[in-house]
Amino acid sequence: MRLISTAFFEQDKFQPKTLVEGAYLALRNDIIKGIYTPSSKLKVDHLKDVYQVSGGTLREALALLVADSLVYAEGQKGFFVSPMSIKDFKEITQLRVILEIQALTQSLKNGNDKWEADVMAAYHRLNLAEKKLALEDIEQRNAQFFSWEERNAEFHASLVSACQSKWLLQFIGILYQQSERYRSLGVHYGTNLKRDLHAEHEALKDAALARNIPLCSEILAEHISITYELFENLPESVFSGKEALAQA
């Protein structure tokens, strides 16, 4: 069973059909939100009570998360949250730029009227979410972040939705999911406050609808790369989870 291939596009619409799928999605979201720190052990006996499933069901969910590289298994020691590092994030960012530009190029060539309408609708929903972020105080803004993240995923997915390569889209989905972990981490350090996300997304939308492939590719590459650049000077302890543990 593979779920992540479509998670990038429909993570907020997906309705789990089995207990394994439900546990997988719940644990996946909690890892991305940083509830479980990088490299921390995921204890089956504890987590089966948290997610109200059997040990066997939870192990199946963890196996799916291993395939997504959000969790790793170590011999007889059990399951652990995958580590994070600035080096890892740099590689994720570089690969996202390469693959998403390829998909964007295909999408802008293939997109029809429905594609344009989907891009406009996704942009409108994202714009509304961004306005909520701007109006709230810091604590409320952080609480709104994950709602914004869903709209952000929808918008990025809409841009490449006319790409006809399922493999390209699947790998983009995996990388996007990994980058979510870092953006979630950035909430606690105010990295998103140092940029004008609305202006970036508006420029991306306008270039896409104009079918200007060179300009849209340039804007997308810069948009993705800025996120990494805002993390470059953070201490490594932020990514290892040690700083979070020290503050607990």
Segments the model singles out, each with a brief description of its role:
Residues 72-73, 152, 196-197:
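Short, flexible turn/loop "capping" segments at secondary-structure junctions
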Residues 85-90, 108-111, 139-144, 184-191, ...:
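A ubiquitous short alpha-helical element
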Residues 102, 114-184, 199-210, 215-225:
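Conserved amphipathic alpha-helical segments that form helical-bundle/coiled-coil interaction surfaces
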Residues 21, 97, 120, 195-199:
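Amphipathic alpha-helical repeat elements characteristic of tetratricopeptide repeat
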Residues 32-36, 104, 108-112, 131-139, ...:
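Short, flexible helix-adjacent loops and helix caps
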Residues 1-109, 236-248:
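Short linear motifs at protein or domain termini
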